[in-house]
Regions:
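N-terminal leader/targeting and accessory segments in enzymes
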Residues: 1-94, 98
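Phosphate-binding loop of NTP-binding sites
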Residues: 91-199
Length: 199
């Protein structure tokens, strides 16, 4: 990742730093929400899901070599550095928005009721003939997947093709706040997701 320090992260997500201040200028190597994919000096983001609260994995993650972790609660017995935040999900979105701004590369945003993925693949295929292009992988197109896609960007990437999907009111506003696309592609607007969006 490009020059993201623990100090940057603490400030961007309005967090509270718990740890040795000498570490604040250390740069992280990556950001992950997956406790099984820990690389040395990464930042771990524990997400509270419907069935699993990833805070339980923090001790193991830190033992595997993570530089620090976020936490939605105070960890009084922690022997490792962490940033306490109100919401891990909101923090990861704030960090993604900040990181993308630092890279200053063009963004193509793609959305629509159907056809997003195939359109993304076609656009990325054309762009990669001339530019180093990063595209959304799989279904990483929601409020967690989009930030994780952004974190895959490197300094030598020249353009990002980001798929954005919604299932609730206000979600597109939150996604575009992160991506701030320079070019937008809307494949179509149909009757998908009406179970959450209504008529």
């Amino acid at each position: 990742m490009k020059n993201l320090t623990l100090r940057n992260l603490t400030e961007v997500c309005s967090g509270t730093w718990h740890g040795d201040d000498a570490l604040l200028d250390r740069e992280i190597s990556a950001i992950t929400t997956d406790s099984r994919k820990i690389e040395k000096d990464c930042l771990f983001v524990p997400i509270v899901g419907e069935r699993v609260d990833a805070h339980r994995f923090i001790p193991d993650v830190m033992a595997k070599g993570a530089l620090a972790t976020l936490s939605e609660r105070e960890l009084p017995d922690a022997a490792y550095p962490y940033i306490q935040v109100a919401s891990s999900l909101q923090a990861v979105k704030d960090i993604a928005e900040f990181y993308l701004q630092q890279l200053q590369i063009p963004v193509v945003g793609i959305t629509g009721s159907v056809g997003k993925t195939s359109t993304k693949e076609v656009i990325a295929s054309v762009l990669k003939e001339k530019y180093r292009t990063l595209k959304t992988q799989g279904n990483f197109n929601n409020e967690l997947g989009l930030p994780l896609t952004v974190f895959r960007l490197r300094e030598d990437d020249q353009i990002a093709v980001l798929e954005m999907g919604i299932s609730d009111f206000g979600e597109m506003t939150r996604l575009t706040r992160i991506a701030k696309p320079d070019t937008c592609v809307i494949t179509n607007i149909g009757t998908c997701h009406l179970e959450n969006l209504g008529d």
